[in-house]
Regions:
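Aromatic- and charge-enriched surface segment that lines or borders ligand/interaction sites
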Residues: 100-150, 183, 273, 320
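Gly/Pro-rich hinge or "lid" segments in bacterial periplasmic/extracellular proteins
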Residues: 93, 156, 160-161, 165, ...
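Ligand-site clamp/hinge motif
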Residues: 217, 247-292
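N-terminal lobe/hinge region of extracytoplasmic solute-binding protein
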Residues: 56-106, 224
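Extracytoplasmic/peripheral linker and loop segments enriched in polar/acidic and small residues
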Residues: 46, 111, 374-375, 426-437, ...
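Periplasmic-binding protein-like
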Residues: 141-142, 197, 302-303, 317, ...
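Long beta-strand-rich cores associated with HINT superfamily self-processing modules
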Residues: 526-553
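Structural transition elements
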Residues: 348-387, 405-410
Length: 553
C-alpha cells in the first residue's frame, strides 16, 4: 500500500503467522476459532470520564470507498468503519472479524463461516452475499479500482480474466453457500490467503447504499458500514469524526465514544498539537525534533518496527531511465548511511532491497554494491554514467518528484546534493499534493519520484508482486518476463523455505535491473499519549483498531 510515511528499520517484532492454516499446506481440514479482542483493560485501570480520541492522519483522504483507495491514510479511517473477514490483534496476528471460523482442505478452496450477529449500521444483517458483491466490485473494470490487482495476486479464480475485460465479473471464484457461509476458490494453493483477507480492498460495502447513492455513498448522511464506528462528520481538509456503531456485534466492548482523524500534513504542526494536549497520537514526528523529544517527552515517544520501505522509482518508459546504467548509477550514488544516520537517526536502516528485514519468513541478502564504501559506489556510478554517454560537458539532468512533506523534502534535497557532488548530476526538485502526486505517478508524468510501500500483509509477496509486469501501482513500469516467472513460481509454492529462496532470486534480479533505488527501511515513530491504553506496539503493519483503545485517567 502506498504511503506518505517516512521512517523505517529492523526491530524486535518479526511476526510469524502462527496458525497452521496459514502456514501449512496440510490436506486435512484446518478450522480456526479465536476469542475476539476488543478493549482489553487491565484490572485496576481507572478510565477517564471523557473517552474521545483525536489522532493525526497525515493528509486528507482521497476516498473512503474501500474498492477505490490505495493509500495508508485512507486505510486507517476505513478500518474503523468497515470490518472484513479477519482483523489483527496487537501483535499482528490474524483473528476473526466478520468470519468467526474458516477452513480449507487444500489451500485452494477456503470456506468462511460468518457470525450471525454481524450487522450493518442500518440494522441489515451482514451476509455472504455482501462479500460476493464487494469482491466482484473490486475486480469489475467499471469500478476502476487501483487495487484490483490485489485479488488477482491471490490467484482468485478468473480474477485476472475479469480485470482484463475478458470474462464477466460473475465468473469470479466466490460464492455464498448460504446467508452465513462464504466460499472462495483460488487457481493455485496460497497457504497465507487468510492473512491477505485483512486488506482494505476486500472489506465489504453495503450494496443497496452503493447502488442508490453512487459516488456519494461515502458521505456521512449516506454512509452505511459494518465496522465498530460509523461516520458522523467529514469536513474535507479539516476532520473526520466517527462514533460507535450501536449495531456492531461487539459494541458492548467499545470504550471510546468518539474518534476524530485530523489531516495534518505538517509534522511540526502535528507535534505541536500533541504537546498542547489537542491530539492523542501523531501520524509521525519531524525528524529535526527527534532528539529533543527523546529528552523531553520520553514517555510519549513511541518507536516500533514498520513493514515499509522507502525508495525512489525511475520512469523506465522515458529516456535516459530506460538505460540500466543510468538507474544503477543514481542508486549507487545515494549515501544511505548519511540519510539513516545523520538525517533521520531514529533507528532506520539502509535498504538495498525492496522487502524489509522484519518481513515474516524472509532474510534478505545485501547485494555486492551494498557492501562497498560510498567512495567505491560513487566511482562505479561515474563509470556507468560515462558509459551511458554523460559527462561534465553533457551532464544528466532530470526532475525528482515527491509528495508535499518537510521530511520528504529534506531527503530529496540531500539526495540532490549527493547526485550533484558525487557524480555531477543536475536535479530539479518538484513537490505535489498527495492526490496530484498519485495521479502523476499513475499516469507516468515524472522522471524519477519518491515512493514508499507498506506491506498489505506480512509476507514477502506483498512487496515483490508490486514489481510484476502490468502492475503499474505507484508509477512502476518494470517489465521482466524472468521476474514475472519467479513471482508466479513463488505464489504457487506452499513451502516457506522454497518461497524464500525464490524471493531472494527476485530481489537479486531487481538489483541487476534497478527499476527502483531502495533507500531505507522504516520505523514508525510518533508521539503517543501515556494516557492512551491498548496502543498496539507489536503490530508492524501499524493496524490500529480504535475499538481496542481506551483513555486512562
Amino acid at each position: 500500500m502506498q504511503t506518505k510515511k517516512l521512517f523505517g528499520v529492523k526491530c524486535m517484532y518479526k511476526n510469524k503467522i502462527t496458525q497452521a492454516l496459514l502456514l501449512g499446506a496440510s490436506l486435512t481440514v484446518a478450522a480456526t476459532s479465536f476469542s475476539s479482542l476488543a478493549a482489553d483493560i487491565p484490572a485496576g485501570t481507572k478510565l477517564a470520564k471523557k473517552q474521545e480520541l483525536v489522532r493525526g492522519n497525515g493528509t486528507e483522504v482521497a476516498s473512503l470507498d474501500p474498492q477505490k483507495t490505495q493509500g495508508v491514510p485512507e486505510s486507517h479511517v476505513i478500518r474503523e468503519l468497515l470490518e472484513g473477514l479477519v482483523n489483527q490483534d496487537a501483535n499482528g496476528n490474524t483473528i476473526p472479524g466478520v468470519a468467526e471460523t474458516w477452513e480449507t482442505t487444500d489451500n485452494k478452496t477456503f470456506t468462511f463461516h460468518l457470525r450471525k450477529d454481524a450487522k450493518w449500521s442500518n440494522g441489515d444483517p451482514v451476509t455472504a452475499e455482501d462479500f460476493v458483491y464487494s469482491f466482484k466490485r473490486a475486480v469489475d473494470p467499471a469500478t476502476a479500482s487501483p487495487y484490483s490487482w490485489y485479488l488477482e495476486m491471490t490467484t482468485m479464480k478468473n480474477a485476472d480474466e475479469i480485470i482484463a475485460g475478458k470474462a464477466d465479473k460473475e465468473t469470479l471464484g466466490v460464492k455464498a453457500l448460504d446467508d452465513y457461509t462464504f466460499q472462495v476458490e483460488l487457481e493455485t494453493a496460497v497457504p497465507y490467503f487468510v492473512v491477505m483477507m485483512g486488506h482494505t480492498t476486500v472489506k465489504p460495502v453495503h450494496k443497496a447504499t452503493v447502488e442508490k447513492y453512487g459516488e456519494k455513498w461515502t458521505k456521512p448522511e449516506n454512509f452505511v458500514g459494518n465496522g465498530a464506528f460509523v461516520l458522523k462528520n467529514w469536513v474535507v481538509n479539516e476532520r473526520i469524526e466517527m462514533v460507535p456503531n450501536e449495531k456492531y456485534w461487539d459494541n458492548d466492548k467499545t470504550v471510546l465514544t468518539k474518534v476524530t482523524f485530523l489531516p495534518i500534513e505538517n509534522q511540526v504542526a502535528d507535534m505541536n498539537r500533541f504537546l498542547a494536549g489537542e491530539i492523542d497520537f501523531t501520524y509521525e514526528i519531524p525528524n529535526e525534533h527527534f532528539r529533543r523529544l527523546q529528552k523531553d517527552e520520553p514517555e510519549s515517544l513511541s518507536i516500533k518496527g514498520d513493514l515499509c520501505t522507502y525508495y525512489y522509482i525511475f520512469n523506465t518508459n522515458k529516456k535516459p531511465f530506460d538505460d540500466v546504467r543510468v538507474r544503477k548509477a543514481l542508486s549507487y550514488a545515494i549515501d544511505r548511511d548519511i540519510i539513516t544516520g545523520a538525517l533521520l537517526g531514529q533507528g532506520q536502516k539502509p535498504a538495498y532491497f525492496l522487502t524489509p528485514e522484519i518481513t515474516a519468513n524472509f532474510n534478505p541478502v545485501t547485494p555486492a554494491y551494498g557492501k562497498l564504501t560510498q567512495k567505491e559506489r560513487d566511482a562505479e556510478a561515474k563509470r556507468l554514467l560515462e558509459e551511458a554517454g554523460f559527462s561534465k560537458a553533457n551532464p544528466l539532468k532530470f526532475t525528482l518528484l515527491y509528495n508535499t512533506s518537510e521530511n520528504h523534502k529534506k531527503i530529496a534535497a540531500a539526495v540532490q546534493s549527493m547526485w550533484k557532488k558525487g557524480i555531477g548530476v543536475d536535479v530539479t526538485l518538484e513537490n505535489q499534493e498527495w492526490k496530484t502526486y498519485l495521479d502523476s505517478k499513475d499516469q507516468g508524468n515524472f522522471d524519477a519520484a519518491r515512493a514508499g510501500w507498506c506491506g498489505d500483509y506480512n509476507e514477502a509477496s506483498t512487496f515483490l508482486t508490486l514489481m510484476e509486469s502490468g502492475n503499474t501501482t505507484g508509477g512502476i513500469h518494470y517489465l521482466s518476463k524472468a521476474y514475472d516467472a519467479l513471482i508466479q513460481k513463488a505464489i504457487k509454492s506452499t513451502s516457506d523455505v522454497e518461497r524464500e529462496k525464490i524471493y531472494l532470486e527476485a530481489e537479486a534480479l531487481l538489483t541487476k535491473d534497478m527499476p527502483i533505488a531502495p533507500i531505507y527501511q522504516y520505523v514508525k515513530a510518533r508521539l503517543v499519549s501515556p494516557k492512551l491504553g491498548g496502543y498496539p506496539v507489536g503490530n508492524v503493519e501499524d493496524k490500529i483498531y480504535s475499538k481496542d483503545l481506551y483513555i486512562k485517567e
